[in-house]
């Protein structure tokens, strides 16, 4: 069976937004080729990236490649719709770079397995490791938390700096027995980590149906589905019960729109962990958090990505 590969030359900042667009248009898989992962100096020995070749990456910017089971007649419509959606991202103030689009035909066996070479076990901290389901991994110690991911339908592998920042913040700030809201859950990796770190239960929410299905599959894969309620929902709309922790790894443009709702659903003393924030938007997010009554307690960085931890006093 032949598939169509759509490649978009974009920026690191727009990677997740562009990936989401491609899934909405019917992509069965996405590969992100970012040269930064070759040269990144991580702030700890963790988060290692393995077995990557410079020949697989662009000289500048990022390639986001999607694979769709469409023929040439349907592909024209998909590309036109993609152009319209990319234009909307620009209207939202997101820098999408060149946003050039290239199309190629590929055989199913070329994409179904080749992308897996990019995804190996990643040590997020001395307690937590993310591994793909097809990789063998021996825990380094009995208390190590292993999160298994199958990113076949997902919006990420869990190794993006923003995800790692959120995981480390959860490990530091979430207490055993806490209840958690995971807004824009994607693969549900943060929800899974929260349960394995001792959360009582998690409500994982995403507006995208594909993300909801992916999240449900990953919670079952990790044996935590009985403690995680995955729901299709727009941010915190309609959510009333207060919890100890809210986590959101989404775009800064989205975070600033619902900080009032975060304050509303947090218990006094509760924690909001937000990421998906490029450094240039740090001040905007902090201003929105403070305006909503939240107190900034920590800012964490990996390269140009930021996670902000705030509390409701």
Curated annotation (Swiss-Prot):
Gene Ontology annotations of biological process type: methylation
E.C. number(s) listed in UniProt: 2.1.1.-
Pfam families: PrmA
Main location: cytoplasm
GO MF, one example: protein-lysine N-methyltransferase activity
InterPro entries from the UniProt entry: Ribosomal_L11_MeTrfase_PrmA, Ribosomal_PrmA_MeTrfase, SAM-dependent_MTases_sf
Highest rank taxon of the organism: Bacteria
Catalytic reactions on record: L-lysyl-[protein] + 3 S-adenosyl-L-methionine = N(6),N(6),N(6)-trimethyl-L-lysyl-[protein] + 3 S-adenosyl-L-homocysteine + 3 H(+)
Gene Ontology cellular-component terms listed: cytoplasm
Family recorded in the similarity comment: Belongs to the methyltransferase superfamily. PrmA family.
Main function: Methylates ribosomal protein L11.
HAMAP family named among the record's database cross-references: Methyltr_PrmA
Name of protein: Ribosomal protein L11 methyltransferase
Organism of derivation: Brevibacillus brevis (strain 47 / JCM 6285 / NBRC 100599)
Gene name in the database record: prmA
């Amino acid at each position: 069976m032949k598939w169509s590969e759509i490649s978009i030359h974009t920026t690191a900042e727009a990677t997740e937004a562009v990936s989401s667009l491609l899934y909405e248009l019917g992509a069965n898989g996405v590969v992100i080729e970012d040269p930064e992962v070759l040269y990144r100096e991580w702030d700890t020995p963790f988060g290692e990236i393995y077995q990557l070749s410079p020949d697989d990456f662009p000289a500048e910017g990022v390639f986001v490649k999607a694979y769709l089971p469409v023929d040439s007649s349907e592909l024209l419509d998909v590309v036109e719709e993609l152009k319209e959606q990319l234009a909307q991202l620009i209207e939202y103030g997101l820098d999408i770079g060149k946003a050039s689009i290239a199309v190629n035909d590929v055989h199913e066996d070329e994409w179904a397995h080749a992308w897996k070479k990019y995804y190996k076990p990643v040590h997020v901290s001395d307690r937590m490791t993310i591994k793909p389901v097809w990789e063998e991994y021996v825990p380094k110690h009995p208390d190590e938390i292993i999160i298994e991911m199958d990113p076949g339908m997902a919006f990420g592998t869990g190794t993006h700096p923003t995800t790692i920042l959120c995981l480390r913040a959860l490990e530091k700030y979430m207490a055993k027995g806490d209840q958690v809201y995971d807004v824009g859950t994607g693969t549900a990796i943060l929800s899974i980590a929260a349960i394995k770190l001792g959360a009582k239960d998690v409500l994982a929410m995403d507006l995208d149906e594909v993300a909801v299905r992916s999240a449900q599959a990953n919670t079952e894969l990790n044996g935590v589905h009985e403690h995680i309620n995955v729901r299709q929902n727009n941010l915190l709309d309609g959510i009333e019960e207060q919890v100890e922790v809210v986590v959101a790894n989404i775009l800064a443009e989205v975070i600033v729109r619902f900080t009032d709702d975060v304050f509303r659903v947090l218990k006094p003393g509760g924690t909001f962990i937000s990421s998906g924030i490029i450094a240039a938007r740090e001040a905007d997010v902090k201003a929105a958090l403070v305006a909503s009554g939240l107190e900034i307690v920590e800012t964490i960085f990996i390269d140009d990505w930021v996670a902000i931890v705030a509390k409701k006093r």
